[in-house]
């Protein structure tokens, strides 16, 4: 199979998809909802729960309303992309697999300065944390490596390995440009470059105005409360997947309220706690749902061990 042209943003994504598909990952499509990071995708957050084997890779558009800069900052956007890889259980050679992906992109670890800098990760809203590293390529952070220890307040057993590529940053390095907007997204049939700015600059300008000045605060507070109530109701109904969608909607409403500066510092902590409580309830409900199914994707010995432990705890 020929390798995509990694000198374009489009080709870079295709090359990462190709590489991780060859490593046996389920290549998924982006989640069709607003999330702040690829970790929120059910393929990471929910699949990290329980003993079942899971390997996947996907691009995830990520929205962080407070990071908008009206299209004026060459390195900071309120909408950008992550390439997410989830390997469960985390393989012993995960670091070698990652370095292999860089080679596939034309970045030779023998030539370039690649450093793993300890940087443990935490998501207060998801009740998740892990041991990890930032990966620096010639002095610029391009990837976050995390070994999940806990998700939704539940211990990760086995541990899930997560690799999150900052694909705009890698593309800026490969294309040797100083502004995200100057990245070549692809080349038109007539040879004209289509840039990242052609695709997204207007969106950054307008969405920054929306996030900071026009998002309806009353509607967002109401949305948060409604999604919170819906999530709780769905958990009671034994439906963790739609309940989790409500968690993501509530989280995005919170992020927009944060951008509108509608939440005080003390209120902010209270909102984070409300989302975390929902996420924990979803995590437990998802574990229980998979337990009821007998953890069909888990190796037999591990499945039996976790089921026996869950049954013993249930009898206490």
From Swiss-Prot:
Pfam families: tRNA-synt_2e
Keywords carried by this UniProt record: Aminoacyl-tRNA synthetase, ATP-binding, Cytoplasm, Ligase, Nucleotide-binding, Protein biosynthesis
UniProt entry tagged with the keyword Transmembrane helix: no
Any one GO molecular-function label of the UniProt entry: ATP binding
Any coiled-coil regions, as ranges: none
One Gene Ontology term from the biological process aspect of the record: glycyl-tRNA aminoacylation
Organism: Teredinibacter turnerae (strain ATCC 39867 / T7901)
Location (main, coarse): cytoplasm
Family from the record: Belongs to the class-II aminoacyl-tRNA synthetase family.
Subunit structure: Tetramer of two alpha and two beta subunits.
Name of this protein: Glycine--tRNA ligase alpha subunit
EC number: 6.1.1.14
Cellular component aspect of the GO annotation: cytosol
Catalytic activity field: tRNA(Gly) + glycine + ATP = glycyl-tRNA(Gly) + AMP + diphosphate
InterPro entries per the UniProt record, alphabetical: aa-tRNA-synth_II/BPL/LPL, Gly-tRNA-synth_heterodimer, Gly-tRNA_ligase_asu
Compartments in which it is found: Cytoplasm
């Amino acid at each position: 199979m020929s390798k995509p042209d990694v000198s374009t943003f489009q080709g870079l994504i295709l090359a990462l998809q190709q590489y991780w598909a060859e490593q046996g990952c389920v290549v998924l499509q982006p989640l069709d909802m607003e999330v702040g990071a690829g970790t929120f995708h059910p393929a990471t957050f929910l699949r990290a729960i329980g003993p079942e084997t899971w390997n996947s890779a996907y691009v995830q558009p990520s929205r962080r309303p407070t990071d908008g800069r009206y299209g004026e900052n060459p390195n900071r956007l309120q909408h950008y992309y992550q390439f997410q890889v989830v390997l469960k259980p985390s393989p012993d050679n995960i670091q070698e697999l990652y370095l292999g992906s860089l080679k596939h992109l034309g970045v030779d670890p023998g030539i370039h300065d690649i450093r793993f800098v300890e940087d443990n990760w935490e998501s207060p809203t998801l009740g998740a944390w892990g041991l990890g590293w930032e990966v620096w390529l010639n002095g610029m952070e391009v990837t976050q490596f995390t070994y999940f220890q806990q998700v939704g307040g539940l211990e990760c057993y086995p541990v899930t390995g997560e690799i999150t590529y900052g694909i705009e940053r890698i593309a800026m390095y490969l294309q040797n440009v100083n502004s995200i907007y100057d990245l070549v997204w692809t080349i038109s049939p007539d040879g004209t470059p289509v840039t990242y700015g052609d695709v997204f600059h207007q969106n950054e300008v307008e969405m920054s105005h929306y996030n900071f000045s026009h998002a309806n605060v009353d509607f967002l507070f109401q949305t948060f409360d409604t999604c919170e109530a819906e999530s709780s109701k769905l958990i009671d109904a034994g439906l963790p997947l739609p309940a989790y969608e409500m968690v993501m909607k509530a989280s995005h409403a919170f992020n927009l309220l944060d951008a509108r500066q509608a939440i005080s510092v003390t209120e902010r902590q209270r909102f984070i706690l409300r989302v975390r409580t929902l996420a924990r309830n979803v995590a437990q409900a998802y574990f229980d749902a998979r337990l009821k199914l007998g953890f069909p994707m888990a190796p037999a010995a591990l499945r039996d061990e976790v089921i026996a432990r869950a049954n013993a705890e249930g009898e206490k």
